[in-house]
Swiss-Prot record:
Membrane topology field: Single-pass membrane protein
Chief location category: membrane
Location in or out of the cell: Membrane
A GO MF label: protein kinase binding
Keyword DNA damage: no
Residue ranges crossing the lipid bilayer per the database entry: 233-253
One term under GO cellular component: membrane
CDD domains linked to this entry: CYCLIN_ScPCL1-like (cd20557)
Protein name (database record): Protein CNPPD1
Gene that specifies this protein: CNPPD1
Length: 410
């Protein structure tokens, strides 16, 4: 609360004319409401909640502060003594705050005085000097030294000596700027709010408002908010990065699995080509067909993981065996070493379209192919046209039988 708001009225002017007719200064009611709400004085005017004595939280703060300021073990200040003196001498909150200003001055100007005086005497004499400064002679709130002595249990001569020593230590500088009073009030409010919040275990709305007005709490709250914002940003970046990494990993794995089924292009295997051409006629068909089926299934398996596993299982499954051949008639026929069947025709095997003799490997290579077929490479889009199985000629079988009888007579 600003000091200007206390001295000026609602119109923003303050006139000395008719000053005696004012019961309160402008803004006094706001200050009283602030003290009652934040210093725990209470709102019941008819009960024992007036501003003529210190509240329990303020008394606790006063005891703690005066015990630290005057560490003498003689007549150590207690809360019961503070409550008794404040009730008997009608100590107001403003007198309490002014006394705290005086004690703070003594800590900086004359710390030796605080080492020799007891905390109880310091409380009594500081409250008495502050009350005399605020309430001049002729006011209803003035309290004489004998009344202060009776309230504090101190003789009047002793009390007078304590007063002279206190004024000497203060160097008679009792004037206090109102801004210092409001600074002490703000500090006292924060101490009370923090102490009561810790004692209860939770803070009220008023306590939080008081604490957030302090520069220390504002800096702490600002630093906490900045750290929370930084932590939130880091967590958001980490989350987005993890999601992007997971999506990229799934895409790369899926693409690699799809491409692994398709063989990479390379030079043709001449041995494989010649070996496929020299295989027997009937078994060669089911042995070459699975490789072509694997290529087509792999091409289709790149569209999905399910088809990929199906093609993998199909490639691992062995091809079905061909049906057994019917028993040959007991004739003297030659046995074709390529077709594994009895030949009855010319020496040329029409089933595999190759003569029944040793075929050079170089003729089966794709560079010397004379039939105009596409190269039998796995990556070629044109599939290798396989010859249709046919029965071997009877003349070739008879020729082989004659050759056998000639080589092995009898």
């Amino acid at each position: 609360m600003d000091l200007t708001g206390l001295l000026l009225d609602e119109e923003g002017t303050f006139s000395l004319a008719g000053f005696q007719d004012f019961t309160f200064l402008p803004g006094h009611q706001k200050l009283s409401a602030r003290i009652r709400r934040r210093l725990y004085y209470g709102w019941d005017w008819e009960a024992d909640c007036s501003l003529e004595e210190l509240s329990s939280p303020v008394a606790d703060i006063a005891v703690e502060l005066l015990q630290k300021a005057a560490p003498s073990p003689i007549r150590r200040l207690q809360k019961k003594y503070v409550a008794h003196v404040s009730r008997e001498a009608c100590i107001s909150p403003c007198a309490m705050m002014l006394a705290l200003v005086y004690i703070e001055r003594l800590r900086h100007r004359n710390p030796d005085y605080l080492q020799h005086v007891s905390s109880s005497d310091l409380f009594l004499i500081s409250m008495m000097v502050a009350s005399k400064y605020l309430y001049d002679e002729g006011e209803e709130e003035e309290v004489f030294n004998d009344e202060w002595g009776a309230a504090g249990g101190v003789a009047v001569p002793t009390l007078n000596a304590l007063e002279r020593g206190f004024l000497s230590a203060m160097d008679w500088h009792l004037y206090t700027d109102p801004r210092e009073i409001f600074e002490v009030l703000s500090w006292l409010e924060s101490c009370v709010a923090e102490q009561q919040g810790r004692w209860r275990g939770w803070y009220t709305y008023t306590d939080l408002c008081v604490l957030l007005e302090q520069p220390t709490w504002q800096l702490a709250l600002g630093s906490l908010c900045q750290r929370l914002v930084k932590l939130s940003c880091l967590l958001a970046v980490a989350y987005v990065s993890s999601v992007a990494l997971a999506v990229a990993s799934v895409a790369v794995i899926h693409q690699s699995l799809g491409l692994s089924c398709i063989p990479t292009p390379g030079p043709p295997d001449l041995g494989l080509t010649s070996r496929c051409l020299l295989e027997p006629c009937i078994p060669s068909v089911p042995q070459c067909l699975p490789s072509l089926a694997n290529v087509s299934s792999c091409l289709e398996g790149s569209m999905g993981l399910r088809s990929l596993w199906g093609s993998l299982l199909a490639s691992l499954t062995p091809p079905p065996l061909p049906p057994p051949d019917p028993p040959a008639p007991p004739t003297l026929l030659h046995n074709c070493h390529l077709c594994q069947k009895l030949q009855r025709d010319s020496p040329t095997c029409h089933a595999c379209l190759h003569p029944n003799r040793t075929v050079p490997t170089a003729l089966s290579s794709p560079w010397y192919h004379t039939y105009g077929l596409a190269p039998p490479w796995p990556w070629s889009p044109v599939l290798l046209s396989l010859p249709q199985p046919q029965q071997c000629s009877l003349f070739s079988v008879m020729e082989l039988a004659r050759l056998k009888s000639f080589v092995f007579p009898g």
